[in-house]
């Protein structure tokens, strides 16, 4: 297997620390809201990596944490008049439900930050004892100047972190790049039960120390792969390396670093101010199948930016329809026997830096072969291989009958679209526009194509 290692900046062969047990850590969600599709992209990509590693090696320990203590969580709890557990329990449950709908496997371990506070405190004390952290007014800071290799992941020079004389250094810091390991409790923390006793007083951990502590707790000082979104590369992952390597001299923390690219919506970064934050829950509740969302997320290479726009779903729907249509043409039982093998071409694509779009293109080549051949045995064999291989990628999870089952609402929508088409043909543009507006009021958006056909999707 070959993967692109952010740490070295090149694709390199994957050489495990121990071939009998591959160790992987991935940064999971911060549970203050429903997970958005950018978060979901990361979860789905590393789900495929997990599946691949399980295929290639006898044992894989996959740890994906949950950040359940954070400023954003505290803000939501305060606004809602709840404690942090009341907030996080709702969104942890929702996260699990949403990821199940995207056909994601459960990780081996899914630790919560609040269950590992003592591990964090012990790690912080180690850093203080080794001269890599200092206490100022009940706040513990990491001293970036104590770690000469700081910046190795993000390729930043520590001097770049000096912002200039016009920007004040945060109170208590010795260097602008120093970051918080432990912060003292506020009145709000006490009220919301978001603080714990420590040698430095009542308080709560900084974000970065959480992942260092949980990865150490479940994977030890060194492990094979650390994954996450490109937005976490700096400062989060850079700080993780610094903390962990300083707490355990001689360690290197993670051997391979994998980062998935950014996801935008209609060419723009998702943000509350733009009102374009798109959650998995919104898509599912609007009628978009989880398998369709997963297909879109896998159809762009994980390191490339992915722009989510309305026609993306239309195109993905057509692609999956093509696959299910091919399966519907095979008039035999397609239940899988144990001897049905995965497509080696697809596995090879995944072994080449998790190339999921190329793997999907191989699936479509198989569909073409199914459609071309009239040999029943060959068609059946190809169909079974297609199902087995697609299932490995987490798609084609339905029977073709279930996939194409149309509900009454869909039939009504298609009927209105047909009426609109006739109205346009008769130059009755007012009626056509009235139908468009009626559908829009029901959350149905129409997209007219150059060939005269019309696609629709739920916004």
UniProtKB/Swiss-Prot annotation:
Keywords (A to Z) from UniProt: Aminoacyl-tRNA synthetase, ATP-binding, Cytoplasm, Ligase, Metal-binding, Nucleotide-binding, Protein biosynthesis, Zinc
Primary location: cytoplasm
Ranges spanned by the short sequence motif 'KMSKS' region, renumbered to the chain: 269-273
A GO biological process held by the record: cysteinyl-tRNA aminoacylation
Cellular compartments per GO CC: cytosol
Cofactor requirements of the protein: Zn(2+)
Compartments where located: Cytoplasm
Top-level taxonomic group: Bacteria
The EC number(s) this enzyme carries: 6.1.1.16
Binding of Zn(2+), residues: 27, 211, 236, 240
Top EC category: ligase
Entry note: cofactor: Binds 1 zinc ion per subunit.
Sequence motif 'HIGH' region, location on chain: 29-39
Positions of ATP binding: 272
Entry annotated with the keyword Cell inner membrane: no
UniProt record similarity statement: Belongs to the class-I aminoacyl-tRNA synthetase family.
NCBIfam families (UniProt xref): cysS (TIGR00435)
Oligomer status and interactors: Monomer.
Protein name as it appears in the record: Cysteine--tRNA ligase
């Amino acid at each position: 297997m070959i993967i692109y290692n952010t740490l070295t900046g090149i694709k390199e062969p994957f050489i495990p620390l121990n071939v009998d047990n591959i160790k992987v850590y991935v940064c999971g969600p911060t549970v203050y809201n429903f997970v958005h599709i950018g978060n979901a992209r990361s979860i789905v990509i590393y789900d495929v990596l997990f599946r691949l590693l399980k295929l290639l090696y006898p044992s894989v320990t996959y740890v994906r944490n949950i950040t359940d203590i954070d400023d954003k969580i505290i803000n939501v709890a305060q606004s809602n008049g709840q404690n942090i557990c009341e907030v996080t329990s709702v969104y942890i449950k929702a996260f699990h439900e949403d990821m199940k709908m995207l056909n994601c496997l459960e990780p081996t371990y899914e630790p919560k930050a609040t269950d590992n506070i003592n591990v964090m405190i012990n790690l912080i004390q180690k850093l203080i004892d080794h001269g890599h952290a200092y206490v100022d007014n009940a706040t513990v800071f990491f001293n970036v100047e104590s770690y000469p290799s700081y910046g190795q992941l993000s390729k930043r020079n520590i001097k770049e972190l000096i912002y200039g004389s016009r920007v004040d250094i945060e109170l208590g810091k010795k260097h602008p790049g120093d970051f918080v390991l432990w912060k003292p409790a506020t009145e709000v923390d006490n009220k919301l039960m978001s603080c714990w006793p420590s040698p430095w007083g009542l308080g709560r951990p900084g974000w970065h120390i959480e992942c260092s502590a949980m990865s150490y707790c479940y994977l030890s000082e060194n492990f094979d792969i650390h994954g996450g979104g490109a937005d976490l590369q700096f400062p989060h992952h850079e700080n993780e390396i610094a903390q962990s390597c300083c707490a355990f001299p001689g360690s290197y923390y993670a051997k391979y670093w994998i980062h998935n690219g950014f996801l935008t919506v209609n060419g723009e970064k998702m943000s509350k101010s733009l009102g374009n934050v798109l959650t998995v829950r919104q898509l599912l509740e609007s009628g978009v199948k989880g398998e369709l969302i997963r297909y879109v997320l896998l159809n762009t290479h994980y390191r490339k930016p992915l722009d989510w726009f309305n026609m993306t779903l239309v195109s993905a729907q057509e692609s999956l329809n093509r696959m299910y249509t091919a399966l519907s043409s095979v008039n035999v039982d397609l239940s899988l026997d144990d001897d049905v093998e995965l497509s080696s071409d697809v596995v090879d694509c995944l072994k080449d830096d998790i190339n999921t779009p190329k793997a999907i293109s191989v699936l479509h080549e198989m569909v073409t072969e199914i459609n071309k051949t009239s040999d029943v045995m060959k068609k059946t064999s190809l169909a079974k291989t297609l199902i087995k291989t697609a299932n490995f990628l987490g798609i084609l999870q339905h029977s073709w009958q279930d996939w194409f089952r149309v509900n009454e609402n869909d039939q009504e929508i298609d009927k209105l679209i047909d009426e609109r088409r006739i109205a346009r043909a008769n130059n009755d543009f007012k009626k056509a526009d009235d139908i468009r507006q009626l559908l829009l009021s029901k959350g149905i958006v129409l997209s007219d194509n150059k060939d005269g056909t019309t696609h629709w999707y739920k916004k």
